[in-house]
Amino acid sequence: MAQESINMQQDLDVCYQLSNSQKEPVNIYTYVRENQNDPVFKGFIPKLKDHFLGRLLNQGYDGDTYGEFIEEERNTVRIAGEQIYRCKTIRINYTTYDVRCDGDTINPRTYPDIMVKSPEIGLHAQPFWYARVIGIFHTSVLSCHLEVAEKSTHRMDFLWV
């Protein structure tokens, strides 16, 4: 019983839950090449590498981008085996207005629409951003960038919106 309550507390402390499954591998370069005429895929790999590098460098995130990196910096990012792994769902945990723990499940096929707090400030800033989740993925990333502290492989979870 005590172990069960410890596991429950650990689950509540986690912001989200995403499968570790590697049952649906996607070769990222083949995936983009096969869909090159779809505007959604325009600049996908450079943007994804920018995102990974920004996270690895612990840069501030404004909710839209970490900023642009030059090609030389992007080339320091390696996606292990050129594989990303598709997941069917992700569960997002949160605290409700009445201080209860709750969560929502996002599924790109059935419940793809999300709303997040906007980082924008100012008189005409919108309080929320809205997006549609196209895919849920995880992968392993390695970077040899000089400023990345740990030169080991890092698991990266990401939503494609």
List the predicted regions and their residue ranges.
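Terminal interaction-prone segments of large eukaryotic proteins
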Residues: 1-161
